[in-house]
Amino acid sequence: MTYFVFFLSLCFVLGGLAVASNPSPYYGVVGLVLASVAGCGWLLSLGVSFVSLVLFMVYLGGMLVVFVYSVALAADPFPEAWGDWRVVGYGVGFVGVLVVGLVVGGFIECLNFGVVTVDSVGMFSVRLDFSGVAMFYSCGVGMFLVAGWGLLLTLFVVLELVRGLSRGAIRAV
């Protein structure tokens, strides 16, 4: 099980690296799907199946709509793939920043700084919230409505910003 969780964490980091290395949106969506599947699988291995399913459906549903709009707006005849030198340079730079962060984080952990939780004994000592399903339906409703409204507003703002002389996705008829 430990190897499976390490594999999922590696897939999560590689998926995030695939999105952040700035290839064309055609390839970025593959990294997004990889990262979200790995993150939800990680939550599933911790026993939080409902939260994993909700995050998978909401995140992929919302972000894939944004990627569809960005693919429609970025109609490149020759899209950048992960093998291009500029994208490889971004990937190497991000991996370098990750390694420096891990080294600095390791030194800080040796100095006993950082966050200490109640169950901080090992890697799998996580206090699970068994009332998370009830919190989604009781206290979380208002926050979900605010977040949904904010995402809808952000979508229209981005579409209006990239429109450019009535040649974008929102056209005056």
Curated annotation (Swiss-Prot):
Gene3D superfamilies named in the record: NADH-ubiquinone/plastoquinone oxidoreductase chain 6, subunit NuoJ (1.20.120.1200)
Catalytic reaction(s) noted: a ubiquinone + NADH + 5 H(+)(in) = a ubiquinol + NAD(+) + 4 H(+)(out)
Transmembrane domains' residue ranges: 1-21, 27-47, 48-68, 88-108, 139-159
UniProt key word Cell membrane: no
Membrane-topology annotation of the record: Multi-pass membrane protein
Keywords attached to this entry: Electron transport, Membrane, Mitochondrion, NAD, Respiratory chain, Translocase, Transmembrane, Transmembrane helix, Transport, Ubiquinone
Origin superkingdom: Eukaryota
Protein's cellular compartments: Mitochondrion membrane
Pfam families: Oxidored_q3 (PF00499)
Enzyme Commission number(s) of this protein: 7.1.1.2
Gene Ontology CC: mitochondrial membrane
Protein name per the record: NADH-ubiquinone oxidoreductase chain 6
Organism from which the protein derives: Fratercula corniculata (Horned puffin)
